[in-house]
């Protein structure tokens, strides 16, 4: 039975795990690392890089390196958060054909789902390499506070990557699964998850295989990226004060500052001070300029103080919704790389009144939980019941633009809820159902998920027709809505296609594109392997020709030299078949040389035997002397 993998598709890093017996195992990638940077790069040579190779070349290719695309997934181009992001990243964020935020590289547009699919493909290949078999099914994690559009876009990314997404699972819930799988006693825990781009807080009751989410809250635009950018701004401002040069307009310099910020942030988790040293960061008429400064932990903490405090309000809201006080939480589990920051741990300790639990790896625990959920769905993990919730209220717009909730936030999913509405005008023969998600009282202040029309309502005075609207949220947190005219029995049902979102045709096209890219990548890899083999063959043949060239005729020697020259001339060719053909030709004409080498080694064999015999005689003498000594 094929394995189901668990993927933590992170803003900064991604991780893949699989069930190995009764335990979840994190799989190392081809570079030997347990997490993979969520970075995709397009080089000038038309090559596509994913993960560490992409991150490594970011400084020299800032506009072609796409990172933190998870912050754009499922968002409209005119979203205020997208506006904010545009000012912070060196790559181009553009308006997609559907009005969503997309990215553009070398004139080609990509949806965030497509970029995410490239990262998921890398995770899929990592798992396939380890398991030695094809992987087709996965459980993928998302921030608990992701809305329907963001969840749907993540599911689309899985489809584009060639994966059947069995379940979309919330990151804190996945972490709780990994933490509590072996816990028998009942506990109330809080999962505080501060990652690269998002923040979640979930309150759960766990015990004896039951994981029940009581409430969840968060901020989908708060994470390590914001801490990094705060440092980038500080470095640039300090440099401007000192040198009078603004680095914020220099994309190459900004990318170097970002790398330095990430490194400084990590170092300050374990030391009180770090040094930033960036030689040749820029230049003016007077010559090259270098950026050198010291940064203390205290200064860093003061720069990001408001970001740290932003995590407290969602914690308060989650506790309130769960009907609990901070003191009633038995354990606080820290998830996400940012929770290694001492200030974060201090705030958590202060708010909950207890030291956080540090027994799980914050970078890996989410992927492990996803793998466990995969095991549950496959039937390999028994006696586990997971009860998750919808993070935001769902409803429709009613008369006067009011948001009428049908499903309240923190309702256990899957769930279904119906309510009867009527017409606002006499003889109204159609109604438009506009579906929103959020917590504001007016519909337009919330996130519009989509809309549809119910037509053919028989003429009647206002308030007489009965229209039943049904919301259905599946276990992935994805919404289906139907509206039915109870008088005629006419029904209209939709899976909420986000007001932007990808159509089935878009997804199909992107799947084909991804498959073509996979074929291209395979072709490119075969080309590299063929060139490596060709260079090795040239090297060994030239060496043999130097040593044994006098053992073949002049004509044969010339044929070999010509074949070597021909093969060298096609080493830079993109035609792999041509390289293979020239290799075959060189191998054929070199056969006589191989024969000469073999004959030469055969001729040397008798001498070797004589040497061996004389060695044996010495050994015998040596042993005999020892016997006499005894």
Curated annotation (Swiss-Prot):
<dbReference type="InterPro" id="IPR012725">
    <property type="entry name" value="Chaperone_DnaK"/>
</dbReference>
<dbReference type="GO" id="GO:0140662">
    <property type="term" value="F:ATP-dependent protein folding chaperone"/>
</dbReference>
<dbReference type="InterPro" id="IPR013126">
    <property type="entry name" value="Hsp_70_fam"/>
</dbReference>
<dbReference type="InterPro" id="IPR018181">
    <property type="entry name" value="Heat_shock_70_CS"/>
</dbReference>
<dbReference type="Pfam" id="PF00012">
    <property type="entry name" value="HSP70"/>
</dbReference>
<comment type="similarity">
    <text>Belongs to the heat shock protein 70 family.</text>
</comment>
<protein>
    <recommendedName>
        <fullName>Chaperone protein DnaK</fullName>
    </recommendedName>
</protein>
<dbReference type="InterPro" id="IPR029048">
    <property type="entry name" value="HSP70_C_sf"/>
</dbReference>
<feature type="compositionally biased region" description="Basic and acidic residues">
    <location>
        <begin position="515"/>
        <end position="529"/>
    </location>
</feature>
<dbReference type="InterPro" id="IPR043129">
    <property type="entry name" value="ATPase_NBD"/>
</dbReference>
<keyword id="KW-0597">Phosphoprotein</keyword>
<comment type="function">
    <text>Acts as a chaperone.</text>
</comment>
<keyword id="KW-0143">Chaperone</keyword>
<feature type="region of interest" description="Disordered">
    <location>
        <begin position="515"/>
        <end position="553"/>
    </location>
</feature>
<keyword id="KW-0067">ATP-binding</keyword>
<keyword id="KW-0346">Stress response</keyword>
<dbReference type="GO" id="GO:0051082">
    <property type="term" value="F:unfolded protein binding"/>
</dbReference>
<dbReference type="InterPro" id="IPR029047">
    <property type="entry name" value="HSP70_peptide-bd_sf"/>
</dbReference>
<feature type="modified residue" description="Phosphothreonine; by autocatalysis">
    <location>
        <position position="198"/>
    </location>
</feature>
<keyword id="KW-0547">Nucleotide-binding</keyword>
<dbReference type="GO" id="GO:0005524">
    <property type="term" value="F:ATP binding"/>
</dbReference>
<feature type="compositionally biased region" description="Basic and acidic residues">
    <location>
        <begin position="540"/>
        <end position="553"/>
    </location>
</feature>
<feature type="region of interest" description="Disordered">
    <location>
        <begin position="600"/>
        <end position="630"/>
    </location>
</feature>
């Amino acid at each position: 039975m094929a394995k189901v993998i668990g993927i933590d598709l992170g803003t900064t890093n991604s991780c893949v795990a699989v069930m190995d017996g009764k335990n979840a195992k994190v799989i190392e990638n081809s570079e030997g690392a347990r997490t993979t940077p969520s970075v995709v790069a397009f080089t000038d040579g038309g090559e596509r890089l994913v993960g560490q190779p992409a991150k490594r070349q970011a400084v020299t290719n800032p506009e072609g390196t796409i990172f933190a695309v998870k912050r754009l997934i499922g968002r409209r181009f005119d979203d205020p958060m997208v506006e904010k992001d545009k000012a912070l990243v060196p790559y181009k964020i553009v308006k997609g054909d559907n009005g969503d935020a997309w990215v553009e590289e070398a004139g080609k547009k990509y949806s965030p789902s497509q970029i995410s699919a490239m990262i998921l493909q890398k995770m899929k290949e990592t798992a396939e390499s380890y398991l030695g078999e094809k992987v087709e099914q996965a459980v993928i994690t998302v921030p608990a506070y992701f809305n329907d559009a963001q969840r749907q876009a993540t599911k689309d990314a899985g489809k584009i990557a060639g994966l059947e997404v069995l379940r979309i699972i919330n990151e804190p819930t996945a972490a709780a699964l990994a933490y509590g799988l072996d816990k028998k006693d009942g506990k109330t825990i809080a999962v505080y998850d501060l990652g690269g781009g998002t923040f979640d807080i979930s309150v759960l009751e766990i015990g004896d295989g039951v994981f029940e989410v009581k409430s969840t809250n968060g901020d989908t635009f708060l994470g390590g990226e914001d801490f990094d950018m705060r440092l980038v701004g500080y470095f640039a401002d300090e440099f401007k004060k000192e040198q009078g040069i603004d680095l914020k307009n220099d994309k190459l310099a900004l990318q170097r500052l970002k790398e330095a910020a990430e490194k400084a942030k990590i170092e300050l988790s374990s030391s009180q001070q770090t040094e930033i040293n960036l030689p040749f960061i820029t230049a003016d008429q007077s010559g090259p300029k270098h950026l050198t400064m010291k940064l203390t932990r205290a200064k860093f903490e003061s720069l990001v103080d408001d970001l740290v405090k932003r995590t407290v309000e969602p914690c308060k809201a989650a506790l309130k919704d769960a009907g609990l006080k901070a003191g009633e939480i038995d354990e606080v589990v820290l998830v996400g790389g940012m929770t290694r920051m001492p200030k974060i741990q201090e705030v958590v300790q202060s708010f909950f009144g207890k030291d956080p639990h540090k027994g799980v790896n914050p970078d890996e625990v989410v992927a492990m939980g996803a793998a466990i959920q995969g095991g549950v769905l496959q039937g390999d993990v028994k006696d586990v019941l997971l009860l998750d919730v919808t993070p935001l209220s769902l409803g429709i717009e009613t008369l006067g633009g009011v948001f009428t909730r049908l499903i309240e936030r923190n309702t256990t999913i899957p769930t279904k809820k119906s309510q009867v509405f009527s017409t606002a005008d006499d003889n109204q023969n159609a109604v438009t159902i506009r579906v929103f998600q959020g917590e504001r009282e007016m519909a337009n202040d919330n996130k519009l998920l989509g809309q549809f029309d119910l037509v053919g309502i028989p003429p009647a005075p206002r308030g007489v027709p009965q229209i039943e609207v049904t919301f259905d949220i599946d276990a992935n947190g994805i919404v289906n809505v139907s509206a039915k005219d109870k008088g005629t029995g006419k029904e209209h049902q939709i899976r909420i296609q986000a007001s932007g979102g990808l159509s089935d045709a878009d997804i199909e096209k992107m799947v084909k594109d991804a498959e073509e890219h996979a074929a291209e990548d395979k072709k490119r890899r075969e080309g590299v392997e063929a060139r490596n083999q060709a260079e090795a063959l040239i090297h060994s043949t030239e060496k043999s020709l130097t040593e044994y060239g006098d053992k073949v005729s002049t004509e044969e020697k010339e044929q070999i030299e010509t074949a070597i020259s021909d093969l060298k001339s096609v080493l830079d060719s993109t035609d792999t078949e041509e390289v293979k053909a020239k290799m075959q030709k060189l191998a054929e004409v070199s056969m006589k040389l191989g024969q000469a080498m073999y004959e030469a080694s055969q001729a040397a064999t008798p001498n070797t035997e004589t040497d061996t015999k004389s060695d044996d005689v010495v050994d015998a003498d040596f042993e005999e002397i020892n016997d006499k000594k005894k």
